[in-house]
Amino acid sequence: MVCEGKRSASCPCFFLLTAKFYWILTMMQRTHSQEYAHSIRVDGDIILGGLFPVHAKGERGVPCGELKKEKGIHRLEAMLYAIDQINKDPDLLSNITLGVRILDTCSRDTYALEQSLTFVQALIEKDASDVKCANGDPPIFTKPDKISGVIGAAASSVSIMVANILRLFKIPQISYASTAPELSDNTRYDFFSRVVPPDSYQAQAMVDIVTALGWNYVSTLASEGNYGESGVEAFTQISREIGGVCIAQSQKIPREPRPGEFEKIIKRLLETPNARAVIMFANEDDIRRILEAAKKLNQSGHFLWIGSDSWGSKIAPVYQQEEIAEGAVTILPKRASIDGFDRYFRSRTLANNRRNVWFAEFWEENFGCKLGSHGKRNSHIKKCTGLERIARDSSYEQEGKVQFVIDAVYSMAYALHNMHKDLCPGYIGLCPRMSTIDGKELLGYIRAVNFNGSAGTPVTFNENGDAPGRYDIFQYQITNKSTEYKVIGHWTNQLHLKVEDMQWAHREHTHPASVCSLPCKPGERKKTVKGVPCCWHCERCEGYNYQVDELSCELCPLDQRPNMNRTGCQLIPIIKLEWHSPWAVVPVFVAILGIIATTFVIVTFVRYNDTPIVRASGRELSYVLLTGIFLCYSITFLMIAAPDTIICSFRRVFLGLGMCFSYAALLTKTNRIHRIFEQGKKSVTAPKFISPASQLVITFSLISVQLLGVFVWFVVDPPHIIIDYGEQRTLDPEKARGVLKCDISDLSLICSLGYSILLMVTCTVYAIKTRGVPETFNEAKPIGFTMYTTCIIWLAFIPIFFGTAQSAEKMYIQTTTLTVSMSLSASVSLGMLYMPKVYIIIFHPEQNVQKRKRSFKAVVTAATMQSKLIQKGNDRPNGEVKSELCESLETNTSSTKTTYISYSNHSI
């Protein structure tokens, strides 16, 4: 035999030498009767091998242990049952009988490898030239059975070990229970197929179950060996690929656990208490001992077990551990109970089942009796009568893998049937081409089979020899002190889970959690722990940020704020200054009083227009000034009214116009007085532009500058309304408001009022210059007091208005400050300049008479005397200077005979 360079990395010489040595050894040591003492042989045209765990693993040094009734005898009999059915079927392998050679693996991979050498004996060239009988004759060897295919094994570790040798001899193998993902590697296990889905499908189903239950933090527990380790590896890989499930810790159960090992495992699992879910890929015995350890440590109800098909719906692992196992979710390839097998197995007796060499041992174990003196049981146990019956005198429940054993045998039979149809068309029995079956060719037919299995489900294989994944999902439940594995769903490439049918330990009404961190509240984002994506800290989206997704927060648009739970944004409420607001009531009240007072003054002046006091006040400029005062009061209503384009236009026009009217008139007055007295110091000629018409022209020229500025403002930046969200963007979004207002910035406001303030300052300067003019000649002093007070008002206005930039009440404070300042300025002018005159007109009409006409010469004399007495004013009381000035003016006036220009109609 030569090496298969393309298939194997090394020459199979070692296996051949081992097999040959084993064959020679057995030939020398065994008699014919002993050869088959531990195997079942049924003759046929085509022989199929079978590997079953008839016995459990023995103690140290002993290959086999106690009998396994269900996993061993039930499955073994299922193969014999299937062989009988096929041999009876006239349409399947007609005129061809199948035989079997069934071996016991004793649940140990090394022992199974030794036993499986029996299957390749016929393929090993025998050299017995050195072997002689006692009489010198050559020995006569029994011709070994030629095995065309093998059914088995059960455990993945056993199948892997056996598959390595069967592939060397091109013997196809179909397993009924091995689910390790490793066996899907078609480059290493190319002659291996199975009628059960691999654990990769099972792992996918378990990941889907964990995800459906909202668990993202789990631990894994595996029995040492291919099945457990491969299953956990597949689960870990799939969970890593899809994300959302993290492994808290992975524990492994040793093949030979030490005393107390299982308690240590439970304690280690408790180190991550939030990972309540435990994914188990463990053998039946390990499952039972884990549950025992959890019970011993009083952990009932803590762990949420997710068991693989090795747990399935078996009673043995949970026997006397019911409370610990309650709520366990287990998975099992979809199966059905085969009624035909039940009838077959119940009819088995010692008399009709002699082909099963282990049936007598099963009989003793099943009925608790002893068969004669050669039985294996103790002598004090009752003797078997042979009249016992299965299911009548003992409990019976069909083992879960019986269906798959039958399907595996039928898969081999259908492959042989199709092969016979192609290679031996019309031939009865085996034709020469099938006298020696080519294993590689048979493998092709196996992978191509497609039939309805014993449970009515399709049996097929993919390119790797795997069956499709179909699983039933169970939950171990306790109801009224009775226990059951209840079907709660199924998995066929996707999960179908009846969550409402699930029941948990201690009657928990909600699904128990197995998460590293609890879900964040609405409005909080996850800040994951580095290296552990399923663990996180919750951080609230602060300020104007809202939760976009579970990992991030984003800032709301300028016109929006987070909603109550910060999962989205909502429009910020829009506000404006309402008429009923305290911030509006006070300015409006002051403005109304001012308008009433101004109207009263205007009416009084109009009514007494030709009286000396009104004429002496300068009627034309007085009406201009009163108009400005009226506008200063009126602007309050425009500033409080709801903004729109028209209101904003009026605000721009009248915001500075009232002040401009007032201070333009006052400036013209003070300038006239100043020029008259300055001119009087130099000559007796009257200065220019002191007539009423000239004064009006000057006043309206000054006002036109303001109007021109407003016009330019209209052109450059047409009036419109805006919603200012930054003005009241408070730290607390709940208090944020959008302010509906005209688009008048602080800079625009300064520019609008700046010209009026310039007029006010200039007027104040003239008032200071004319402060020494005799009060009998002019209004310089009242104007001066008015301007001083007005300056104080506006100096107070500036810090209040511009110091509220960061205040939540900015709009209210600024509007109220501006309107009240303008009303106060108007009130000062009205009160100091006109209320005394109105008082005289109304209450002292006798004083409203003309005392004398003032000539410009008198003004010149007054100005000259004023200049001379300025120096004396530093050393003498003001009263004396004033008296002297007045006496001089009286004398001068009475002695003058010169013609003079009368100013009685022109206020100085």
UniProtKB/Swiss-Prot annotation:
Disulfide bonds join 64-106, 246-534, 369-384, 424-431, 516-535, 520-538, 541-553, 556-569. GO terms for biological process: adenylate cyclase-inhibiting G protein-coupled glutamate receptor signaling pathway; adenylate cyclase-inhibiting G protein-coupled receptor signaling pathway; G protein-coupled glutamate receptor signaling pathway; regulation of synaptic transmission, glutamatergic; visual perception. Pfam families: 7tm_3, ANF_receptor, NCD3G. It is found in: Cell membrane. InterPro entries: ANF_lig-bd_rcpt (IPR001828), GPCR_3 (IPR000337), GPCR_3_9-Cys_dom (IPR011500), GPCR_3_9-Cys_sf (IPR038550), GPCR_3_C (IPR017978), GPCR_3_CS (IPR017979), GPCR_3_mGluR8 (IPR000144), GPCR_3_mtglu_rcpt (IPR000162). Interacts with PICK1. This is Metabotropic glutamate receptor 8. It comes from Homo sapiens. The gene is GRM8.
